[in-house]
Amino acid sequence: MADDLPLEQQPKAWQRVPCTSCHRSYKFYCPKCSIPLGMPEGVTVPTLRLPLQVHVWFQDKIKKSTAPHAKVLAAQDVQIVPYPPPKESDEALPVYTRENAVVVYPSFEAETLGEISADEVRDIQTLIFIDCPWQKAPVIMTDPAIANLRHVKLAQPPKESSFWRYHKAGAGCVSTIEGA
């Protein structure tokens, strides 16, 4: 059983296997289909329920993104929204209201949740993250579906990390879903 292995050997116990949905071969999970793959015997990937819906507006390389990690763990509550929507897709962008959705983005007008009234925080149902290279984010933020939504930011910057991609504007400006 993989849990009995030392921590540094546990990733080696996972096998690279074809995805049951798209048939591409991956180790750990399929970034396209957001399903775990090649789990060792006795290992289960937890399924999480989140208190809010998480929509990740995505315009990057899927294998470079951490959005699929969130989708694998909380499939019912995480939606990856391709941006711009593929031309061949019938799916429109989700519809949000200023009362029930906020964009987690460190803009100049961004507030911390502590600066928003408790009643307004209770009304929030969806957190929207922008997953793209930093230089593309301002363009996405002008999309009519999210342009008029409130922006929220982290109250305290995360500790230094070699994993997160920081923006030149400061350590509190992270560009990965772990910022949540």
Language-model-detected regions and their locations in the chain:
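C-terminal folded domains that constitute the principal catalytic or ligand-binding module
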Residues: 120, 125-127, 134-180
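Short, charge-rich amphipathic segments
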Residues: 1-8, 26, 109-119
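Glycine-rich, flexible N-terminal cofactor/catalytic loop recognition
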Residues: 31-98, 116
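S-adenosyl-L-methionine/SAH cofactor-binding core of RNA-modifying enzymes
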Residues: 71-146
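Short, acidic/turn-prone active-site loops that include or flank metal/cofactor-
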Residues: 61, 84-86, 108-110, 154-159
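Cys/His-rich short segments
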Residues: 3-53
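Electropositive phosphate-/nucleotide-binding environments in soluble metabolic enzymes
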Residues: 13, 27, 64, 170, ...
